[in-house]
């Protein structure tokens, strides 16, 4: 089978398409005939050798996938061959950018009916990340106020949609070119990142930080006493404020969380954010897009099967 591989760490130029043997599902795993798989910033970190969880090369890149189960390993009771599924391969976040991939049965779910495989492959990590930030870490409830930093990104787009569905009051900070897009997703107040004055923002119960840096540090000024700043950006330590809590985490994709997302995808209340769609042999181009080459807004997807 064909697979997107690296044999050493480095830039997009280290990516190759190899012919390798089809993997065999282990205990608690399934083998998926991949229809589509995602390409995301954490794939670039793995490629560069900056991931704390990925194995050493040689390895197959990719974590998000959508496809059809081809075989089932031992101790898997909830899935069978022929099931359409989507989700994540494993806790190491590798192996999905291939014609076949093994996946932990605890990190996949039955694919929702409404989205295509390309759309489904764009969802798992980013949508679950948004869900966890809002409802498992910030614990926000209806009518509370939140501030989203980086609301136009892949996670941000889902965070806005999920927050709007829950009835939260949403302030979003984005670049000027993204303001109308984020407003259309459901944000109540959209501010230009070049002009935002954090101390003038109506005090919020939680900040959802997707960009880190100076904006995250300044955002503490906008949080109510007892509120929280939740971040997925670990490039710098979280500031310590006695009156405001802070939390940093890695997303944990599970069947239960994916099933929640699936319900909303099927009823149309959550819309997939698909960007550029490429073929498997264009994986290097996809990683060049991660590095700044022009591409459509949304998650980059590799279309693998029919």
State what each model feature region is.
Residues 92-104:
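A structural motif shared across PLP-dependent enzymes of the aminotransferase-like
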Residues 258-306:
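C-terminal hydrophobic helical "lid"/dimerization subdomain
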Residues 171, 184-247:
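Glycine-rich cofactor phosphate-binding loops and adjacent beta1-alpha1 units
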Residues 121-192:
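Mid-domain Rossmann-like dinucleotide-binding core that forms the NAD(H)/NADP(H) cofactor-binding site
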Residues 79-80, 140, 223:
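Short, well-ordered loop/turn sites that connect or cap secondary structure elements
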Residues 21-38, 50-92:
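Glycine-rich beta-strand-centered segment in the early N-terminal region that forms part
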